């Protein structure tokens, strides 16, 4: 695992879930986090490569890093406002 991903304060395993479930779970998890905390999302749904960055932009969260060259995909986000 890349070092940047190992710094996450929270982890969400969305393996095996299909759209829209991964983003719904991300939203639920982020709601329970404090501003500035980080979340590692692990998923294998190809739709997440589009949905997670869009979610972050729409909800004012920061996509710190993503690894989508192979499954499982990994995303590290930082909760915004």
Curated annotation (Swiss-Prot):
Annotated active site residues, numbered on this chain, are 19
Q: Which InterPro entries match?
A: Sulphur_carrier_TusA, TusA-like, TusA-like_sf
Task: List UniProt keywords, sorted A-Z.
Answer: Cytoplasm
Question: What is the documented function of this protein?
Answer: Sulfur carrier protein which probably makes part of a sulfur-relay system.
User: Could you cite one Gene Ontology molecular function of this protein?
Assistant: sulfur carrier activity
Name listed for the protein in its UniProt record: Sulfur carrier protein TusA
Q: Look up keyword Cytoplasm and say if it applies.
A: yes
> Cross-referenced Pfam families, in alphabetical order?
TusA
| Annotated family | Belongs to the sulfur carrier protein TusA family.
What's the main place this protein lives?
cytoplasm
Q: Does the keyword DNA repair apply?
A: no
Gene3D superfamilies, alphabetically? TusA-like domain (3.30.110.40)
PROSITE patterns given for it?
UPF0033
Gene Ontology process terms (BP): tRNA wobble position uridine thiolation
Alphabetical GO CC annotations of the entry are:
cytoplasm
Q: Where in the cell is it found?
A: Cytoplasm
């Amino acid at each position: 695992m890349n070092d940047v991903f190992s710094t996450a304060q929270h982890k969400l395993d969305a393996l095996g879930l299909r759209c829209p479930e991964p983003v719904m779970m991300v939203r639920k998890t982020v709601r329970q986090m404090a501003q500035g905390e980080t979340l590692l999302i692990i998923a294998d749904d190809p739709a997440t490569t589009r949905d997670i960055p869009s979610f972050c932009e729409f909800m004012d969260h920061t996509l710190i890093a993503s690894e989508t060259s192979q499954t499982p995909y990994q995303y590290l986000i930082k909760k915004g406002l």
